[in-house]
Amino acid sequence: MIQMQSMLEVADNSGAKKVMCIKVLGGSHHMVAKLGDVIVVSVKDAIPGGKVKKGDVYKGVIVRTKTGVVRPDGSTIKFDKNALVLLNKQDEPIGTRVFGPVTRELRAKKYVRIMSLAEEVL
């Protein structure tokens, strides 16, 4: 579960490495974000020459969480780190590749484009 001030890794090749959550979108009482939710983030660490730079504010969709997700069959999928993919103003991924695995739950949230860019879908 991701809340305000949470630090996340970036799972795409947009140029950002670390981001911090500054707002969880989805209603006035939406305090935490789970897998597939959209949050507003600030770039805290970026590589030189990337598409984004430090201090920029973007939306991002969460693709991996330490808390994990429980499937209908009772199995749980957890990851070592929290990660997200940065989105532009039209809610499309900024990067052209997604590193690491993503979960099938993104399909229900209408993020099929991220699933097609990912190396592995669990």
Curated annotation (Swiss-Prot):
UniProt entry tagged with the keyword Cytoplasm: no
Q: Which UniProt keywords apply?
A: Ribonucleoprotein, Ribosomal protein, RNA-binding, rRNA-binding
Q: Which GO CC annotations does the UniProt entry carry?
A: cytosolic large ribosomal subunit
The alphabetized list of GO BP terms reads: translation
Give the superkingdom in one word: Bacteria
What is annotated about its quaternary structure and interactions? Part of the 50S ribosomal subunit. Forms a cluster with proteins L3 and L19. In the 70S ribosome, L14 and L19 interact and together make contacts with the 16S rRNA in bridges B5 and B8.
Annotated family = Belongs to the universal ribosomal protein uL14 family.
Q: Which InterPro entries does this chain map to?
A: Ribosomal_uL14 (IPR000218), Ribosomal_uL14_bac-type (IPR005745), Ribosomal_uL14_CS (IPR019972), Ribosomal_uL14_sf (IPR036853)
Name of the protein this chain belongs to? Large ribosomal subunit protein uL14
State its role. Answer: Binds to 23S rRNA. Forms part of two intersubunit bridges in the 70S ribosome.
GO MF terms held by the record: large ribosomal subunit rRNA binding; structural constituent of ribosome
Q: Which gene encodes it?
A: rplN
